[in-house]
Every structure is written in C-alpha cells, then in structure tokens.
Amino acid sequence: MLFRSDFKAVMITHEHTDHVKGLRIVGKKYPHAEIYMSKGTWTALKDNYRPEKNQIHLFHPKEKFVIGDVVVAPFSIHHDAVEPVGFILSKKNKKIGFITDTGHICDEIFERIKYADLLILEANHDEEVLKMCSYPYEVKRRILSEIGHISNITAGRVLCRILEDSEGPVYRQVLLAHMSMENNTPEMAHLTVESILRERGLFTFPSRYYFSIGHWVVF
C-alpha cells in the first residue's frame, strides 16, 4: 500500500483478506489516520488485522459521515461478507462512486452510482476464461454467484444503463477495478465494455455521451 504522508483516512469495504491484510501495518505507520468501516466488518475482522481501537470509526451502511470536506455515503452491496459496502464521496457538486466485490447491481445500488462523475466499478473477470481456469468448482461458483463478483460483461451492461437512463449531455469517467490476475486483463475488460457500448449505439453520439474508461486496481 502506498499513501501520501498527509492522507487522513482509510475506508474499508469489507473484511476479506485481500482488502485488510495491510491494515494493521498502515495503522502503525500512520497513527494519525482515521480508519472507517461498518460495524459488521469490525466484528468480523480477525484480531491480527485490527489496528488500534482509537483509530477506528464505525458506521452504519445507511448513515452518511464526513471526512474533512468530503461527505461519504456508504451503501450495502451483495458479497459473501458480513456487512460489505460501497461508497459515494461528494464534494460540492462532484461525486465519486466506488463499488467492487458485489455479485450483482440491484436497482438500489444503481440509483446510488448512476450520477457519479467518476465511477470506480468492478470488472473482475471474463466469464469464459473463469470457467476454463484451474480454480476449484466451488470457487468458480462463488465468483459467478450473486454474492460474488461482477464480470466484464456485467460492468458493460451497467454502464449502458447509466447512459440510457441519463437526460441531456452525459460526461462520465470510469475506472474498471478489482480485475482478477488469473481471469482478466485490462485490455480484455476494456474491449468487452467498449464492445457492449458500441453494440447499443452509445459511442455514436459524442455530443451527448462521453465516457473515459481506464483501469485502476488489479487483484
């Protein structure tokens, strides 16, 4: 994990090891940092990952909180964790949406993320690559389930729906995130998402639709 020395806070989405294994180290290295997580996540967090209690700020998934001049609105997501969340961060009239580790995007989640100016969206795997990989059957079934991870195809469909539900000119920046190192590549994710958008005619009206798609985190 790399941080600026003056960073103020860490927000935890859920207790799975790939998201918290460095948390205790970060807490010791940056004792000034505030660490935010849901009450359920704190309860499920293993002792060897827990930072000092005085750094911890617990929240309910339906209650907003403030970090500096940023308003944070957590929301529940669909993952096999105790109380997993995504986030909407708002400052003035700009919004950042963050959602990874969810098996599907329900209507409630969609309403939360559709107005984000910058959306960090999971595109975890290519479904066919996952089905052919060496993972045990139970692991594959978990990933593909409604409490697993969303695929490149699902990410593309979510972005289509955002555009189709929007009125007037649309500008969005999207970072595809939480990509599997075994079952995805940034190039594969970009190609799939762009192909889905093109099939729906959403790249043919640049005066109305503008999407900037990049990639951010690979797991």
Question: Which residue ranges define each predicted feature?
Answer:
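Core dinuclear metal-dependent hydrolase active-site scaffold
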Residues: 1-3, 60-118
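Active-site metal-binding motif and surrounding structural segment of the metallo-beta-lactamase
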Residues: 1-37
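Short, well-ordered alpha-helix to beta-strand connector turns
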Residues: 7, 53, 116-117
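Active-site neighborhood of phospho(di)ester-bond hydrolases with catalytic His/Asp-centered motifs
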Residues: 7-16, 36-39, 97-100, 120-122, ...
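Active-site environment of divalent metal-dependent phosphoester hydrolases
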Residues: 16-20, 43-44, 81-82, 105-107, ...
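Metal-dependent catalytic neighborhoods of phosphoester/phosphodiester hydrolases
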Residues: 21-30, 46-48, 184-191
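Short acidic-hydrophobic, aromatic-tinged amphipathic segments that line or gate anion-handling sites
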Residues: 56-60, 211
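Cap/insert and terminal regions of metallo-dependent hydrolase folds
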Residues: 107-207
